Structures are given as structure tokens and as C-alpha cells.
């Protein structure tokens, strides 16, 4: 996030009128993790498919139309997708034709993975020149109607969405040797990634064999389009519509050989960083209106001195027995640095967990000198003495506390282990992604990687895998720097008094750097204003002031999307909010409203399912083939899974150890045939290459030499190198300890104050235009840290930033705001 601190704080000029250089704020720290707009696999929206890829190697063969035995009765022949993209929605019409090779009546099952931002709003099934259209009914009625129809020899389809996000429906009594065509309408929220809007069809949606495929995408945006790209498939055709000011375009692609990679369309529009975009959709079906608003602000014009935002920081530290020794020492040191990097606009707290958990405060407290001293005392007592690794109880304690949208909650989790019921834990935190962003650190080689990645991705955060303790603090501070980047929080849409709306989502997640806001709303009545309506997007800006972005809704320019995509996604998000209220046990009965929305817009929900039934013209007399469905392996991680992972890790470690031991063994066998001089040369040469973990083994083998002089020299060289390495490490540790001592003396406001005893400061050299000893002391300490610890810059970036900001505030108070650079240069002469 910061440029080189020496470039920031020092100017080439030494005159008293020097203007200090400030650091522009950007999302460069985030881009180190997610790359550019083409790195779609690092985008938040792709996490659902990432989980599919990691868990199920064979899933690709289970999607589509199958029999319950998962055999090759049905085969996809033709597949066409017609999509339309606007600012906030993507509507896709699927047409799939399957051949049916069964010689007897068969019951099939159709499944596809459905991302959490997508909904099925309609489906039909065709065979024998008949068309069966799905209708939404209450879940109980749909199930009963399906069972009755099948029992009487009729055709029936029952569709539901499973808990793991798969849309599926059973098709009963399909006649033999009759082709089947399935039509789906899928409406998705557009997938924003950095400055782009994306549309992704994962390869798991397509069978792993050849079929005819056609993809047509129609793009209609409210802003001009800069670029359009289709990854992996260069033989696509892109055309911009004439007289559309580059706001409309089409993309087409076809294949005779099926699909072997993800289909990812990336559209980059021009960005209006000051004005949210809006769409007003009119539904001809029932003469209603829906609105969507999207906004991707940029704060790149701000400097680090401008940022003065509120936030809540909670740190959850693994204190199980496996963290003993160097890991817990490093964690404590990192915590001491982090808590000095916070500012007085923050709330903060620390949790320690193992078989049980403790916390510094009952609830997060405001950051000041008193609470900083209290929590620093808590950190000093932290040790790896809490037993096992039970992560769910402390996370539940944190997330069950209602978040304050004025202080966006950011949770940092540091662990080196595994947990039981991992996937249940990840699914739980995902339900709180609207109010909490999670950063995770995985320590060492035995940590459950999917736990670390899954927790962060579920809450749109970031993660670090820390394999080497030597870079511990640096890697920790990388994520902390991201947490400090500009944020728009406490966001609300002021719809004014003319519009009666129902908004989804009701509570808007804080808008972090590089993210896009999307909000939907249904107008509650059909009466609309004759003219434009002014509404506004309001939030707390990164400078600490309220920001307001005007939005003009012009009802003379409504759009009639054929599939009511804006209406549908508005209803979908409202249903999610209502279901979430019930999940949290607020004793609200929202069933009637959920069923009403589900039936109006064709949405599967907690209380609604799709059902299609039709009486057969000829009742099927043969026995319908009934086959056992292949059981999908459970997605829940259990203790046995953890044990298996440990066994695999132990096996790998043992094999590596044996392999290296064999290398050393072979070395000394070959040395038996060499002269003493050759032995000296060969042993010393190879010693430098072997892993340090084998040092004792090497010493043992070297003792087998027939010559005591050779043995003594080899062991002596070995010991000298070990001693040299220890001295080097001790030097680094001592340097780090002295830096930490300086950092721990910093006050909550960023200053270092008198009396200061860490090193001698001559207060008599303080310039006359400075009225406070603390200003002079702080300037000198800044110089001291920059000068003495250049290799540890990433650790103290935020600490120095806070200190310099405090000094500049004091200089502004003294009416000398432009003298920061010259005073810093002067103070450098006195360190």
C-alpha cells in the first residue's frame, strides 16, 4: 500500500518551506493477491466453483441428465446458451437436447451446480412433442403432487435446490428411446472483479465429451465498453452495435467438440467513480417496476494522510499446544506490531482459542492509551497452553454479536492446525459475509489449507500461508495493510418520500477497495412519478466524513427486459434477507411473503419448489426402471479426515527424511575409498547442501571415518557453521527485539512522548517553532526506525504512517503544515 517510506518522508530539498510528499492510496496490495481482471479464479464470485473443483474430482460426470445409476442412458447432443448482460444482471436461456438410449421406461435426474448469486426462474421439459412447464408451489404441495402423479402412471418433475447449491429435479416415467429437451432460464447477479463485469460458465456444467455448442451474449450497459474478451476460446466473434456509443455489443462462439475449459466473458466498462449507475425495469406482465443500482468508487486520489476511517479489528489466535515455541513467539510479536498500527477511530479485541477460548475484553473497545496498555498486557501473557483446536466456539461468539456498520468488522484468524466439521464452519461464516470480512493465516506445513482459504474466501477476505517463520511478521502485515485501504461503510440508499420500495439486500455490506456495490429494489405499488426522482447513495467515506452520491431515476426511460431479470434478482435478494431473519431465530414468520415472491418470480426457496405434472395419454404398463443413486461423498470434514491428513503428512515427511538419510549414507560409503584429503573436501562440500534437520545424522556418519583427524576437521567445520548460523539468527532476533521495544513505546495517537529513555534525545536541539517535546521526539524516533531497520520496513510501515500523520496534524495546529519534510530532515541529524 505504501511506497518506500524513505521516499515518502524525505525530500531532496532542505529549505524550511519544503512540502512533504504523501503516499497515494491504491488497491495495489489487493492486486498482489488477485492480479488483473483476467485472474478470474481469484475473484470472489469464483469461490463456489473453487470449492467444487477441490472436493469432487468426478463431479463433471454427474451433472446434466442422468439415470439414478449414473450410466450413459442419456447423452447431450446439442447445447445452446443465449445470454443478456446489463450493469447488474445476466439472463441465460439454456436449451439442451439429450438422446435417450433406454429400452424401457426410466426415471432420470437432472443436476447442475448453481452459484449462490444465481437463480432458476423457469424451466420446461419436452419429449414426444409435448411441453411440460414448471410452476412454483409450496414445497409440501409440490412433493405430494409429484408422488400422486408417479403412482398413477403420469409424468412428473419435481425441482429443488440442495443445501450445497445444486439445482436438481427428478423426471419420472420417461418413455423409452425418446429424446428429451430441457430449457432453463437462469438469472444471475453480474460478477464484478476489479474494474470488470464477468460472466462465467464453469467447465463442470458441460459433459466431458463432444457435442454441438453455441453461445450468444448480448451486452447492454449504461456506460461505454472499453474491452470485451472471451478467455480460452479465440475463435469468438465480437461486434459493437452501431449508434450505441459503444454501450452495446454482441459476442458469439460455437464449437463442434464440446467444452474443455471454463467459458469466461470479461467486459470492462468505462467507470464513473462519482456517479452510481441505475436501471429501471418495467414488467409488462403485471405492470410493476424494479430498480437496480451499481457503483464502483475509486479512492486513488486520496493519500495515506487523508484516510481516517472507522473499523473494528478482532484477532483470533491459535493457542493450542502445537503452536508452542517459535510460532507463538512470532504471533505475539506480530500482535504487538499490529495493535500499534491501529488508530483512535478503531475498536479492537483479541481472542485466544484452543480447547476453550479467552478474550481480552468482553466486547470490542475503542482504541486509546488505556485500552492499548490493557491489551498489550494480555498479549504478554499469551502462551500455547489451551489444548486442542476448537475454532467454532470463538467464531460463533464473535459473529453472534451484532456488527456495527459504522465500524466495519474485520476478523484476523491465525492457526496452524485442523478442525473437525471444517465445511460446516466455513458454511456458517459465509452466512455472515455481509457484515464481517475475514483474513486468515495458515502457519507451518501441517495446517489445513482448505480451512485457511475457505474461511477467507467465504467472507471475501484474503489469506497467507506462512511456511517460514523468518518472514512471519512481514506476511502478517501484508494482510493488515489491505485492511487499512479506503472503505465506504455504513451504506444506505435514501429513496426519498415519493417511492415506496422493498430493498434487497436490506443491509449493505461495506464497500472495500476494488469492490462493486449492487442493490435491488421492488416498487411496492404501480404508481410512479411523472418526472424524474432524485435518490442518493450515502455512506461514511474513508476520510471520516459522510459521502453522498446522487442518483437520478428517470421513469420515462424504463427498460422492458423479457425475463424480468431486475425484478427476479430483487425478489431473490429480499427472500434471502427474510430467510436469514428466520435462521437467526428472530421469531419472525416470513413464510407468506417468501411464498408470494417465490410464486410471482418463479423462485425456489425454503418454502417453495418447482413441480410439473401431466396425465399420460397412455399409462405406462411396464415396470419403470428404478436404480440406486450413487452416493456423493460427504462434504463434512471429520476427525478421521484430520487423522488421514496427518498420516499423509507424516508419510511424506518420513519418506523425505529417509531419502536424505540415504544420500548421506551413500556419501560416506563412497568416502571409504578416498584419501584423507579427498574425504575432507568431499564431506565439507556435501555438508553445505544437506538439510539442517539432518545435522545430527551427518555428525554421526562423519564419526564413522577411519581417520580421527578427518573426523575432527569435518565436525569442527560443521560446528563452526552451526555457530555462525546461530550468531546470524541471534543478530536478527536482537535487531527485531530492539525495534519492537521502540514500537511498544508508541502512544495510541501515534506519538512518542517525554520522558523517553530508550536512547538519548537532545531536546535542546528542538527547533523554536515547535512547542511540544513530543513532536521532536516523534520525528527523531521516525528517523531512528527508518535508519536502523531498513530490512524490516514492511513491519513498521503502518506504525510510521500513524506517527507521521500525528506530527503533520500538530504542525497544522502550529500553522506550519508545509514544514514536515524539512523538520524530518533536520531531526535526522540528531539521531
Curated annotation (Swiss-Prot):
**Source organism superkingdom:** Eukaryota
Which classification does the entry list for the species?
Eukaryota, Amoebozoa, Evosea, Eumycetozoa, Dictyostelia
**Xref: PROSITE patterns:** VIT (PS51468), VWFA (PS50234)
Query: Membrane spanning segments where?
Result: none
Instruction: List the protein's name.
Output: von Willebrand factor A domain-containing protein DDB_G0285981
Q: Which InterPro entries match?
A: VIT (IPR013694), VWF_A (IPR002035), vWFA_dom_sf (IPR036465)
SUPFAM superfamilies associated with the record: vWA-like
What organism does the UniProt record list as the source? Dictyostelium discoideum
Residue ranges of every copy of the VIT domain listed in the record = 60-188
Cite the VWFA domain residue spans from the record.
312-480
Q: Name one Pfam family in it.
A: VIT
